[in-house]
Amino acid sequence: VAFNISSLTKPVARLAATAQNGLEVLRLGGLETGSTASSHQIVESVPMYRLRRYFAPGAGTEDAGPVVLMVHPMMMAADMWDVTQDGGAVGILHRAGIDPWVIDFGSPDRMAGGMERTLSDHVVAVSDAIETVHRITGRQIHLAGYSQGGMFCYQTAALRKSRTIASIITFGSPVDANAAMPMGMPAGLSADIAEFMADHVFSRFSIPAWSARLGFQMLDPVKTIKGRLDFLRQLHDRDALLPREQQRKFLANEGWIAWSGPAIAELLRQFVVHNRMTTGGFTVNDRVVTLSDITCPVLAVVGEVDDIGQPASVRGILRAAPKADVYEYLIRAGHFGLVVGSTAVAQTWPTVSQWVQWREGEAAKPPSVDLMYEHEAGQLDRGGVPLASRVAHGLSTTTEVAITAARTAGAAAAAANKSVKSIAVEAVRTLPRLTRLGQIHDHTRISMGRLMTEQARRTPHGECFLFDGRVHTYEAVDRRINT
């Protein structure tokens, strides 16, 4: 049996690559991808926010296309729109001929007075940013927001009565708190807990970035564990990890920012305890505002398995904004998967691009976008995401983890078994030689003739050497030497 040296070198190389990549992750927090952020300019910088314009046109360029202003939620950094150059929202929109802008609220714990910000401060900031973008571009703005950022979009549009807003695009943004609370909690219990937290906890404390990250991950622990197992399983294969490394680092650490206590308290009081997004009468700097003042078109992107912005709650915009044409785009994704990841790259952002172009009169309506309709009592799940969907989604993910782990363990066991067999076979053949070599010292006499005779006796018909196209056996060579 021929000894395959790769059966030894491959496991060693894999172990070395795992150690090298693991050390880099421990030292730098992740693998170095070499990717850079998309080019952008800071058009406006004030204490409350910085306004970014991505891929700003050069001097003399009159029009960069339809304008989209993107709003991030309080707990997540504005870089969520540009996690990767190829798969980030700003890059995809830019390639579709759209002019992307981003409002960046920054990290409140690193700014003077940042932890004293209120919800109204964020809404007013978005309104001010709209004024700046409209003044520079001269265009109506398509206002896009993810999760709580989408709630800011609704509230800002209501505050402005849709002035200079071409459309609103939201991703997993809840409106009707009573329709479906996260994790299926009863509305009454949720309201009581929210009121207690607003009055006795967040009036005194804020949420640090690490706590926001941990809370988000615990909403889907199975998926979190699966992601970490997949990362560890592929730690030896740098090329396989690099395409998703920026997204992994963003969710693992870089993407989270602190929440100011007053803003959380105001959010809980107005939109969870009193459900003001639906009933109306929420206040922005002591001014009463209602979503019924929204008159521009609305596109709500709904995640079928989103356990934070649940479908029933997201669809509350239909009742809250009766004067608006409300559309929905239903997609099989969880909360973060609506805007980042392979599903977002392949489905969400191409559809959003086509929506913007359709509202600008430059394209047809996206085929997957439909008018939102009022669900009948039998169709509307007051618990949000149906239990069957949650169980199926969880079992599917758990099964995938188990199968992957079993397959990996099986492959590792098979490789180990093969290596052990190869080593055992080779040991039987080579150990006697190694033992004999170990007996050789500097004073040991060695006879080449004797070695040839032993080899001829052991394998007389074995190939000793090849000369002039002819094989000479050990027996023939030994006989010729002896004569």
Protein language model features and the residues they cover:
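Alpha/beta-hydrolase-fold enzymes
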Residues: V1-P11, R139, F152-P262
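Short, surface-exposed "cap/lid" segments of acyl-processing enzymes
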Residues: T36-D109
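Gly/Ala-rich beta-loop-alpha elbow adjacent to hydrolase catalytic centers
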Residues: A144-C153
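Short beta-strand/loop motif that positions the catalytic acidic residue
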Residues: I294, A300-V302, D306
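Short alpha-helix in the alpha/beta-hydrolase fold that links the catalytic acid
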Residues: C296, Q310-A320
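Catalytic histidine-centered segment of alpha/beta-hydrolase-like enzymes
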Residues: E328, A333-Q347
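Flexible, non-catalytic linker and terminal segments flanking ANL/adenylate-forming cores
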Residues: E376-I446
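Conserved AMP-binding/adenylate-forming core of the ANL superfamily
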Residues: D442-T444, G449, T453, H461-T483
